[in-house]
Amino acid sequence: MPFSHGQVDGWIRAFAAAIAENKEYLTELDSAIGDADHGINMNRGMQAVLGKLEGGSQGDVGALLKTVGMTLVSTVGGASGPLYGTLFLQMGSSAAGKPELSGEDWAAALAAGVAGVQRRGKAELGDKTMIDALVPAVEALRSSLAGGATGGEALHRSAEAARDGMTATIPLVARKGRASYLGERSANHQDPGATSSWLLLRTAEETLAATQSQQQQGT
């Protein structure tokens, strides 16, 4: 791969931009089965994160990820703050002290983050939550790397798996969170948390691809 401190910083900034761009869409999705605030809350949190980023190409990747997590916990309301905060905090713990992440490091960090979200939210595949996008993304990332894929290929497959998991939430009946109160009426709606999780994985792929392209042009 590898993912440098600067690239991780760029990924966080790209995710913030994607959340801002899709704020109304995420809130629209949430209005059907939730509190109609997912896009608003996530955008507020990610804008706060941008204010905490120091930039630079070098540093502790784990510390950077933990900063993101702590900021989200303190600024994002509803369930999203604790869940996304846990994701980044656990990723940060996995990546602690590392100036860059190999493909295997990235997969381990993401897996640790997703496991933390599952523990926190007590959600499983099929519950119509962000887990439906994140778990397939981790599995695709690991299997791709184990099969000899490049970092870019692995991230592409991971993002594709997250997208497929996101769309697979549409027919599901929610079993967790506010949406579960609707019972059968929660079906035929895409889960907003799974959607923002897809944006997280999509921007990871795009950030690495853009950086690799710039490096190739500079050689």
Residue ranges and their predicted role:
Residues 1-219:
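N-terminal loops that bind phosphate or other acidic moieties
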